[in-house]
Structures are given as structure tokens and as C-alpha cells.
């Protein structure tokens, strides 16, 4: 079984991005959230194409406390960037839907799903708009760990033109970030949707370390409850990947057959 080598994989990804762009002109458009995935994806694109061919797009939803992390990313990488506040677009869309259908009849759970996923979809619309205006391709920044349990927004961050990280686990992505000497506070930032105080792992009910080990070794979690939770999330979200087939860097590493990936 092939083992993950951070130096080899990092160089391979950079070369893969170069190869993907060899017959294309224009920019790599990266939605910069301030988390590890967008930070590392932007850094890899800058290494492959040059910093001047990467446009970082910061998209706060109104007042957003962690937008400062997004600014750290573009400043550190020295890439061209712009800020597009999606707050007015989100509020206008929500108001229009409320006028068309009374929200009083909608469950709290459905409201939460809307509140979490709609900003991500608006951001992707904006990213493709910028790609059309400036000439470029939107970078998908999702990782394998998130994708196998559907922890991405269909029509939002799950979209893009190509995916440099889509077959790498969270632990592997972090290792690449450290290898590139990116700021540790960004590479090791605790993942969350930015909408509430809960982390992704708290919402998932298991750690990414546990999930990553299962993905790469095939050894199921000792907890039957966690195993079932992972499988339920995988099965309920697999339709996303039956529909979308992005060009994705393949590290040639084992993925457990349980995930039907």
C-alpha cells in the first residue's frame, strides 16, 4: 500500500496544476475563507502558476468576525484579491423567498440548513461571475474527508472547475500546508461553518483523524455508533459525486472500499 509522502505529493500537485493549465490562459479564482483548504489550494496554485495568476476572493456575509483570517491569507501569499460582501445578496434572496412562501411553516432544522448552505451557493455564483469577467477558472478547495461524508455544499463549495485537494484527507492537506511553511494559525485552524460556535467535528460527531484513518486503512472505528454515523452520511450524500465529476488530482493512495469512491 502506497504511503503518503508530503514532499512528493506537494510537487506532484503543483505539476498537475501546471499541466491542467498548459492549454489554458487566465486566472485561478480561489474563494478565500481563511481556513486551511482555501489557504493551501491558493498557495499551490501560486506555486504552479505564479502569484499574479491567482485571484483571491474574500466574501463575508455582512459582518463576519473571521474575515481577518482571509486577509492574512492573501497578504501572506501576495496574490491579487478583492472583497465581495454577499450580505445584501443573501438578505435580498431570503426576503424574496419569505415573500413567496411563509417561513412560519418551515422547521427549525430546515431553516438551519438554508442558513448554512445558501451563503456558500451565493459565493460560488460570485466566483464564477468573477471568472467570467476576468477570465479564469474557479478552484474547488474541498478535501476527501469532507467529501466522503458530504460535508460540503452542493452548488456551493462542492463546485468548481478543478480540484487539487479532492482526493487528500484532512491530515494530508494539513501536512502539505506545514510543508509549504504557511502560517500555522491558518493551516491548523479548527474547521467550522462560521455560522455558530460549534466546530465541524462537534457537528459530525467524530474527529477527522478518526475518519482519515478509516479512509486510508479500511479499519472501521471501534465505536459502532461512529461507524454507522459515517456510513449514513456517506450514503445520503453520495449522489453529489454521481453528478459532479471534476478533474481531480489523484495521489494514488488507498481509499477504503466501504465509501464506494
Task: List each language-model region with its residue ranges.
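Short, surface-exposed alpha-helical segments at coil->helix boundaries
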Residues: 39-42, 67-71
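Acidic-residue sensor for enzyme active/binding pockets
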Residues: 66, 146
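ATP/NTP-dependent adenylation/nucleotidyl-transfer catalytic domains that generate, transfer
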Residues: 2-30, 44-47, 52-55, 61-62, ...
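Conserved G/P- and acidic residue-centered "switch" motifs that form tight phosphate/ATP-binding loops
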Residues: 35
Amino acid at each position: 500500500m502506497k504511503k503518503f509522502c508530503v514532499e512528493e505529493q506537494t510537487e506532484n500537485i503543483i505539476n498537475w496544476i501546471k499541466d491542467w493549465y498548459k492549454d489554458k490562459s487566465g486566472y485561478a479564482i480561489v474563494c478565500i475563507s481563511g481556513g486551511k483548504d482555501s489557504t493551501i489550494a491558493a498557495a499551490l496554485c501560486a506555486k504552479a502558476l505564479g502569484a499574479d495568476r491567482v485571484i483571491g476572493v474574500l466574501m463575508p456575509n455582512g459582518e463576519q468576525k473571521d474575515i481577518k483570517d482571509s486577509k492574512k491569507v492573501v497578504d501572506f501569499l501576495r496574490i491579487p484579491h478583492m472583497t465581495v460582501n454577499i450580505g445584501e445578496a443573501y438578505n435580498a434572496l431570503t426576503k424574496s423567498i419569505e415573500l413567496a412562501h411563509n417561513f412560519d411553516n418551515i422547521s427549525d432544522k430546515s431553516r438551519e440548513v438554508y442558513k448554512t448552505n445558501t451563503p456558500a451557493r451565493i459565493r460560488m455564483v460570485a466566483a464564477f461571475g468573477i471568472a467570467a469577467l476576468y477570465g479564469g477558472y474557479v478552484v474547488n478547495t474541498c478535501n476527501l474527508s469532507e467529501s466522503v461524508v458530504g460535508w460540503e455544499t452542493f452548488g456551493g463549495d462542492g463546485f468548481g472547475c478543478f480540484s487539487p485537494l479532492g482526493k487528500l484527507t484532512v491530515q494530508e492537506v494539513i501536512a502539505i500546508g506545514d510543508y509549504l511553511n504557511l502560517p500555522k494559525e491558518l493551516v491548523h485552524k479548527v474547521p467550522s461553518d462560521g455560522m455558530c460556535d460549534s466546530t465541524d467535528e462537534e457537528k459530525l460527531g467524530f474527529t477527522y483523524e478518526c475518519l482519515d484513518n478509516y479512509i486510508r486503512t479500511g479499519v472501521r472505528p471501534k465505536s459502532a455508533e461512529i461507524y454507522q454515523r459515517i456510513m449514513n452520511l456517506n450514503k445520503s450524500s453520495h449522489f453529489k459525486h454521481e453528478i459532479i465529476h471534476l478533474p481531480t488530482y489523484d495521489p494514488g493512495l488507498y481509499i477504503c472500499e466501504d465509501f464506494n469512491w
